[in-house]
Amino acid sequence: MGCVQCKDKEAAKLTEERDGSLNQSSGYRYGTDPTPQHYPSFGVTSIPNYNNFHAAGGQGLTVFGGVNSSSHTGTLRTRGGTGVTLFVALYDYEARTEDDLSFHKGEKFQILNSSEGDWWEARSLTTGETGYIPSNYVAPVDSIQAEEWYFGKLGRKDAERQLLSFGNPRGTFLIRESETTKGAYSLSIRDWDDMKGDHVKHYKIRKLDNGGYYITTRAQFETLQQLVQHYSERAAGLCCRLVVPCHKGMPRLTDLSVKTKDVWEIPRESLQLIKRLGNGQFGEVWMGTWNGNTKVAIKTLKPGTMSPESFLEEAQIMKKLKHDKLVQLYAVVSEEPIYIVTEYMNKGSLLDFLKDGEGRALKLPNLVDMAAQVAAGMAYIERMNYIHRDLRSANILVGNGLICKIADFGLARLIEDNEYTARQGAKFPIKWTAPEAALYGRFTIKSDVWSFGILLTELVTKGRVPYPGMNNREVLEQVERGYRMPCPQDCPISLHELMIHCWKKDPEERPTFEYLQGFLEDYFTATEPQYQPGENL
């Protein structure tokens, strides 16, 4: 980005891997989006012909892990006789700028340049037009990435969330990369029985040395497509036959356009404020549009809330944080009044959702799952050596399907209001803040863990203010003396014990977010095997 104030040394802390994965990936469960593509970078003169790649066994294997039904349908022959891999659109896309292409699902492309990462220059074989397309909207023709049922790098818990979405029948399925076995896949199926009701079963799909696939060695298949066809016709030992692929939501774009990928200070005139969603201490939140065609959320800050120079430095880091449980920062207007442009979440804040929205009717399994999503996002922040500083339900946003994402990470450090910077002033969130942070300004990822424990009480009480009946001064005094909130009504003892662990006086004794994520994701399934053996397989 073109701002000289950026802190290079701070930005260098962040790992700029395109899929958001990390070198220290133990416990990593979520990619930046549900269907990441890991295709090599290539230019127009050297596109490898993956569709004609052959293994020793003579099968038409692609390097993407699938077997082509035809070694020619996905290849464009050039005058020199070489093959160029064609890509197919998996979704419809409406162009946002004059630089990108509109296209429909099923449209085929020749890729001209993939050096821009998330945006590829391509030529449509339907219209002949050339422009940029989002790379996670396409896949190589005839590859498994182009199949409706293939979800790529999707974690077990997110697979369950998608399969258990309202309206999916028994037998809804998807195939994803195995989290535990490199090179293998997992088949996840929505099932139902009298005892458990709706639930998901997972089966490991293993690869043969010669490139085939199997769930049981007695039924082996050359391709994943053949495996799916076989189990679509009969259960053959699975919990039920495969009925319909799980619906894929639209992939998330981490930038507004190819141009804002690197230069994301945008003119105020490109934004339209349409509907005010909220009014806070330091500004307002609006639903709006960018360029008249892209729905976004716009946070407008009151002049004097923070220094534009400091904000730009922090935004440089925030822009690099990319995870599907974090609200994506798209762009900024850095002159006062500062505008922060992010992805739009249509259900609003978790606090309002619990108090006045659909959240009032949620049962414990849904509430624990929402907590697990927040923990997953915070585990990513933890791995990236970042700190939120203001973790509470008001700063969690909710979307369709009870999807939760963390917002406003890092901004609290920049606020210059005296009623906030005093840490015990009227605007400071004392009831969510760890004592070492409130008293001495020692904000760390462990003070975020304390705040997460408070957020858990907000979830199980449907948005009740913490420490009911106590003012900020009383809370600070009582917590210092060792007081901790008692177990809320209808809250399981084991969940309250987790809160107590988050509120340990010694920050180092508090759990990691990686631990919290695992604990909450497995809260109701800890006694079950992760993978089903299958019956009579």
From Swiss-Prot:
Activity control: Inhibited by phosphorylation of Tyr-531 by leukocyte common antigen and activated by dephosphorylation of this site.
Binding site for ATP: 277-285, 299
Ranges where the record places region Disordered: 14-35
PROSITE patterns with a match to the protein in the record: PROTEIN_KINASE_ATP (PS00107), PROTEIN_KINASE_DOM (PS50011), PROTEIN_KINASE_TYR (PS00109), SH2 (PS50001), SH3 (PS50002)
PTM annotation (Phosphoserine): residues: 21, 26
Top-level EC class: transferase
Enzyme active site: 390 (proton acceptor)
PTM sites of type Phosphotyrosine: 185, 420, 531
Catalytic activity reported: L-tyrosyl-[protein] + ATP = O-phospho-L-tyrosyl-[protein] + ADP + H(+)
Localization, UniProt: Cytoplasm; Nucleus; Cell membrane; Perikaryon
Gene Ontology molecular function: alpha-tubulin binding; ATP binding; CD4 receptor binding; CD8 receptor binding; disordered domain specific binding; enzyme binding; ephrin receptor binding; G protein-coupled receptor binding
Span of domain SH3: 82-143
One cellular component term from this protein's GO annotations in UniProt: perinuclear region of cytoplasm
Entry cofactors: Mn(2+)
Domain SH2: 149-246
EC code: 2.7.10.2
InterPro entries, alphabetized: Fyn/Yrk_SH2, Fyn/Yrk_SH3, Kinase-like_dom_sf, Non-receptor_tyrosine_kinases, Prot_kinase_dom, Protein_kinase_ATP_BS, Ser-Thr/Tyr_kinase_cat_dom, SH2
Lipid addition sites, S-palmitoyl cysteine: 3, 6
UniProt tissue specificity: Detected in spinal cord oligodendrocytes (at protein level).
CDD domains (alphabetical): PTKc_Fyn, SH2_Src_Fyn_isoform_a_like, SH3_Fyn_Yrk
Residue positions bearing lipid (N-myristoyl glycine): 2
Post-translational modifications: Autophosphorylated at Tyr-420. Phosphorylation on the C-terminal tail at Tyr-531 by CSK maintains the enzyme in an inactive state. PTPRC/CD45 dephosphorylates Tyr-531 leading to activation. Dephosphorylation at Tyr-420 by PTPN2 negatively regulates T-cell receptor signaling. Phosphorylated at tyrosine residues, which can be enhanced by NTN1.
Quaternary structure (record): Interacts (via its SH3 domain) with PIK3R1 and PRMT8. Interacts with FYB1, PAG1, and SH2D1A. Interacts with CD79A (tyrosine-phosphorylated form); the interaction increases FYN activity. Interacts (via SH2 domain) with CSF1R (tyrosine phosphorylated). Interacts with TOM1L1 (phosphorylated form). Interacts with KDR (tyrosine phosphorylated). Interacts (via SH3 domain) with KLHL2 (via N-terminus). Interacts with SH2D1A and SLAMF1. Interacts with ITCH; the interaction phosphorylates ITCH and negatively regulates its activity. Interacts with FASLG. Interacts with RUNX3. Interacts with KIT.
Name recorded for this polypeptide: Tyrosine-protein kinase Fyn
Provenance organism: Rattus norvegicus
